[in-house]
Amino acid sequence: MSNLFPFRLEPWFRTRIWGFHDLAPWYDYKTEGEPIGEVWLTGEMCAAATGPLAGKSLQEITAQHGHDLLGNTYGDGQFPLLIKLLFPKDKLSVQVHPDDAMAQKYGEPRGKTECWYALDAGPGAHVALGIKPGVTPDQIRAGIESSSLEDLLEMIPVAKNDMLFVDAGTVHAMGPGVVILETQQTSDLTYRMYDYGRPRELHLDKSFEAMRLKTRAGKIPPRTVNSHSVLIDEKYFEVERWLLDPAKDASGISKPTGGVQILFVAEGKIRISADEGEAFPVNRCELAVIPASSHNVFVDAGSAATVIRIQPRVA
């Protein structure tokens, strides 16, 4: 295994009808065109911004250096997690994602289980996660036809730093008032059940096939482990929150795990160095990848910083 140096990825701004034209204060990004609703942080078109791999897309890096990059999380050779920021100014559709079995039934490699970490949440912010107990598929169909589907969904209040699990098969929705860091299987399979009168295509047959009336979706309490908090540890991913301080030892954040590690800076900024490479900064709302083969990686915070560490799991 050759030694790959860590690298920062450039974000990929994606247009969505429910997004914003100005992403301040999160990004210095304005557009007079279609609004931006998603910022992909590990999308296949995200390019390395630092080090020997600078200019190469994550798709190219994974194809050319798969085992060195992913290590024991190599799986099928595709980068295993898609990580995004969501900026909803309006309601997203009420939607559901398939599990692996259903996705593969229709020729796709994997389904879509995800989790949401609230980087910010305004007063009264909430999301819809799952169907209320006792509701039947016939009632759901009637709710779609009468534009009252929201009344049948479980509404979950959301505060800053909350973690929510959204397993495949969970009917869910999101609206304004939140900024979400989403970690998901690398899949963009979404079946819309209801879209608030907008003209986008609905996928009712597949939605009802994918939907489960009872799931494990919901808010996950953090678990303190030594110098960090485990926000969620599930089949496809583990997400941790590290509060870095120059006066405290946080060397565990960069210890090798045998697989790829992903660091997202939620607050403050950090600097990453490793053997045989030039150190580079990672600022707020930026993401860095630590390949499985990187040697002697050191993460330094000159002042207080909050870093979200994400590690894929190979199911």
Give the location of each predicted region:
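Transition-metal
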Residues: 1-135, 195-218, 239, 315
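An exposed, glycine/acidic-rich loop-and-rim segment of catalytic or binding clefts
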Residues: 144-152, 163-165, 171-219
